[in-house]
A protein has these predicted regions:
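Gly/Pro-rich, tryptophan- and cysteine-flecked surface segments typical
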Residues: 1-335
Length: 335
């Protein structure tokens, strides 16, 4: 299911976020990571205001508190809480960040992020978050991810073949759009570097820059990487080529989950897609992607499908090809 939000000047959607736990085993498998939600941009400035929504599960809750820790661009934090005398079954919780009186000054007119602990019960807390322009003409929505920064969940990169990526992310440059990668301090602590590569139409790989971002294990601020600007300064952009981030652990401990924000943007809010790097777990990595989704077509809207495929074996692409099949559905039939 896609939840689609439309304004006068924009449209944003997010796929299904929260769900009811199926049984006790489902609760047991997810309870350790379910409480703290994070991994998204927040804004509270002269142009944009963010919001957070969540839904309670099937049980009534009494005398509980919601806790949230906000981080600004400097990595500084402040904590807030809200007390609820009662939360009904399936009740929606809606938070406008402008209701936190200290927050606007604290964020210093720049982007930040937060970690929120919800008092909900028996529901998987992948919550809906987003940002409105102050005139409500533009909107961007995404969903949260769980906070893994207090867990020690690693892959030993000594066991990974040197001809394979430890961790990587193929992506496309779309004409007319900027692209940011936003890295949040929400994964198991590690010292890592991010490099940038390019695959051309002949499937040849070249390194654009070995290190576009260094991340130290104790960082607390956002790391915002403007990929299009970096490619422009180092190389001529070719929209038909596939670009790839090469993530390397400096201490042989690679977080088993590496989540980030994917911001395609023009002059307005970014897409802030919650996405994960492809981590080499030592087994076959299947093709990934969204296999369904709405297509918009009007005088003001168009849909772009961007596909990229890179093997964990760095030179395998030379001898590898993929067949892509697509069906486009209208209201009553396949177009």
């Amino acid at each position: 299911i896609d939840a689609i939000y439309e304004t006068k000047e924009g449209i944003s959607l997010v796929h299904s976020n929260q769900r009811i736990f199926e049984n006790f085993q489902d609760i047991k498998n997810n309870e350790s990571i379910n409480k703290t939600q994070t991994g998204f941009d927040i804004h509270l400035d002269s142009k944009n205001e963010s919001f957070i929504t969540a839904i309670n599960g099937p049980e009534e809750i009494k005398n509980k508190e919601l806790y949230v820790e906000f981080f600004n661009y400097l990595g500084k934090s402040i904590k807030e809480k809200i007390r609820y005398d009662k939360i009904n079954p399936y009740q929606a919780i809606f938070l406008e960040l402008k209701s936190f009186k200290r927050l606007r000054k604290f964020l210093k007119n720049k982007r930040g992020f937060c970690k929120i602990n919800l008092p909900t019960k028996n529901i998987f807390n992948r919550i809906l978050v987003g940002t409105f322009s102050k005139d409500k003409k533009k909107i961007s929505t995404t969903h949260s991810y769980y906070d893994c920064s207090k867990f020690s969940d690693y892959i030993n990169t000594k066991n990974i073949d040197k001809n394979q990526y430890q961790c990587y992310l193929p992506f496309n440059i779309i004409e007319g759009l900027d692209l940011e990668i936003v890295i949040y301090p929400i994964f198991s602590r590690s010292n890592i570097t991010v490099g940038l590569e390019e695959y051309n139409l002949d499937r040849r790989r070249k390194t654009i820059k070995n290190n576009i971002q260094t991340i130290k294990k104790n960082f607390n601020d956002l790391k915002i990487i403007n990929l299009k600007n970096i490619i422009k300064t180092q190389n001529k952009i070719n929209k038909n080529n596939v670009y790839c981030l090469n993530i390397v652990s400096k201490n042989n401990l690679l977080p088993s989950r590496l989540t980030f924000g994917f911001n395609y943007k023009k002059t307005s809010l970014g897409s802030n897609i919650s996405e994960s790097m492809i981590v080499n777990h030592g087994k076959d990595i299947k093709g990934r992607g969204f296999y369904w989704g709405p297509a918009f077509c009007s005088k003001k809207l168009k849909t772009i499908i961007a596909l990229s495929s890179v093997s964990k074996n760095k030179d395998e692409l030379k001898n590898n090809s993929k067949l892509v099949k697509m069906k486009l559905y209208g209201k009553d039939k396949v177009i």
